[in-house]
Amino acid sequence: TKKYPASMYDRMVTEMGADANAYTTDDYTAYHMSFTKDDLEKVVEIESDRFQNLSYEEAAFQTEAGAVYGEYRKNISSPWMMLNEKMQATAFTAHTYKHTTMGFEADIKAMPTMYEYSKSFFTRYYRPENVVLLVAGDFDPAALMTMIRKYYGPWTRGYVTPVIPVEPPQKGERSATVSYTGKTLPILAISWKGERFD
């Protein structure tokens, strides 16, 4: 952000001795940090600033986009990853679950040209209506709520729920074969769709 540029954010996290990371599933992205309770207010402040005021240059975005493509290429060197990608593409014909968390290769390759889209994605999805804030450990709950109101309170609402295509009922078996150029024993994967989880 303008207040906490990437180098400053990284330095602060390191100086706190905090452990920060993130992961993405088909349904959400989670950002997590472990730190001492003495740093609780600073963490609440810098994280609220990051999620409300993220700012990054196009060159940095393009570098990161290249790293994402490298990760994708590494992942598909695994027959299991290729199998999972094909499984999702076969099981779903309309719903966004059709692609893996990383997405389709053509989209990932084009990512360096999607700087403006990345900013609109952030503006659209990173809204207070979409946030779940969890804090666990030794802290004063009343003091924490005061901090949350102070740092997250001004965040402007404005999320517009996207239209997610409804997956039509599957009428029969679907099958697919994955071509894999590396060496592996044969792998068979069988999946069933379950009920929607709300």
Language model feature labels by segment:
Residues 1, 13, 31, 47, ...:
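Buried hydrophobic packing residues in well-ordered domains
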Residues 1-33, 99-103:
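M16/MPP (pitrilysin/insulinase) zinc-metallopeptidase core fold and M16-derived inactive scaffolds
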Residues 3, 34-65:
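M16/insulysin-pitrilysin zinc metalloprotease superfamily fold
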Residues 14, 55-73, 140, 159-172:
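Acidic/histidine-enriched alpha-helical segments
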Residues 53, 57, 141-142, 154-157, ...:
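Short beta-strands and strand-coil junctions in structured, solvent-facing domains, enriched
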Residues 65, 80, 115-151:
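Non-catalytic, conformational "gating/processing" segments within enzyme and secreted inhibitor domains
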Residues 73, 160-198:
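His/Glu-based metal-binding/catalytic segments typifying zinc-dependent metallopeptidases
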Residues 90-131, 163-167, 196-198:
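Histidine-acidic residue clusters that define the catalytic metal-binding segment
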